């Protein structure tokens, strides 16, 4: 999927590449599989409707399909747009959480005092250990969210951000004027590491979020405004569950021969962040 990182900034390039035999083979196979999943979803919805088992939609794709069928003004404008939404949902709903949790594991091993602090907090919250774990109590430990925010600040799952188009009248930002109908991008990775917005910007410091809020800081891990990530709450819930259960159950360290250097320096921009393998050992506490 490395091609996705390139064509996101040059969307017209995909049409050219598709004319070259074999140039987009892997992407086309992925797109075909996503289309099959969309067809299966439509079939299951048709069965539900035929048997009067309609219920409130529980996933984003159901909302999108229903909006198209009902002619809602917020619906994807074309079938092609719906297929693109399917590819986005499948990619964003799987890779991003796995990438982020792997990055969290790396930072926790590289900063053992932070992991020890997390374990102390979890032990205090769950004195009987993992057997007494509940999500409602785990989500009440702010330090878990600090770790999530700081990991996504330094290694956002979608480093490049997304393209936007300026309004026809243009856009004035301080002393800079951007003409209308211009494609712009705010690079998430760069903003997150800018020392104007974060002290010791290159360092992993979860405690900085005791004073900062992801809603007001220069923090774009989930984008902002009406285009914010629709899976933000689900992803946050999954990461809270993984981090809290990890801290209660395991001691972690790099596997023999692993130092994390390649993992930290050889990531690639492929729309979502591509990360090398990270060899680790998990030992029960």
Swiss-Prot record:
Residues 1-19 form the signal peptide. Gene3D superfamilies: Cytochrome P450. Eupenifeldin is a bistropolone-humulene meroterpenoid first discovered as an antitumor and anti-leukemia agent. This metabolite also shows anthelmintic activity against the parasitic worm Hemonchus contortus, anti-malarial activity as well as antifungal activity. Keywords: Heme, Iron, Metal-binding, Monooxygenase, Oxidoreductase, Signal. Disruption phenotype: Abolishes the production of eupenifeldin as well as of the intermediate humulenol. InterPro entries: Cyt_P450 (IPR001128), Cyt_P450_E_grp-I (IPR002401), Cyt_P450_sf (IPR036396), Cytochrome_P450_monoxygenase (IPR050121). GO terms for biological process: terpenoid biosynthetic process. Belongs to the cytochrome P450 family. This is Cytochrome P450 monooxygenase eupD. The lineage of its organism: Eukaryota, Fungi, Dikarya, Ascomycota, Pezizomycotina.
């Amino acid at each position: 999927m490395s091609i996705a990182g390139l064509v996101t900034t040059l969307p017209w390039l995909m049409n050219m590449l598709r004319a070259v035999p074999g140039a987009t083979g892997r992407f086309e196979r992925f797109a075909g599989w996503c289309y099959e999943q969309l067809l299966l979803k439509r079939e299951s919805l048709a069965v539900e409707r035929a048997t009067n088992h309609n219920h409130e939609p529980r996933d984003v794709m159901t909302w999108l399909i229903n909006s198209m069928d009902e002619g809602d003004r917020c619906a994807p404008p074309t079938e092609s747009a719906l297929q693109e939404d399917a590819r986005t949902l499948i990619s964003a709903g799987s890779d991003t959480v796995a990438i982020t949790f792997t990055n969290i594991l790396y930072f926790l091993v590289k900063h053992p005092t932070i992991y020890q602090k997390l374990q102390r907090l979890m032990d205090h919250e769950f004195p009987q250990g993992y057997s007494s774990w509940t999500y409602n109590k785990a989500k009440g430990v702010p330090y878990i969210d600090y770790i999530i925010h700081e990991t996504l600040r330094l290694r956002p799952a979608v480093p490049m951000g997304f393209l936007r188009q300026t309004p026809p009248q243009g856009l004035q930002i301080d002393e800079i004027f951007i003409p209308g109908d211009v494609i712009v991008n705010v690079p998430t990775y760069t903003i997150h590491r800018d020392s104007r917005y974060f002290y010791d910007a290159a360092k992993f410091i979860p405690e900085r979020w005791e004073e900062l809020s992801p809603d007001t800081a220069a923090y774009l891990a989930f984008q902002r405004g009406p285009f914010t990530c629709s899976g933000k709450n689900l992803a946050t819930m999954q990461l809270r569950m993984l981090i809290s259960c990890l801290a209660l159950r395991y001691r972690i360290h790099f596997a023999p021969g692993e130092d994390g250097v390649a993992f930290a320096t050889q990531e690639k921009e492929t729309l979502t962040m591509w990360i090398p393998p990270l060899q680790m050992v998990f030992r029960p506490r």
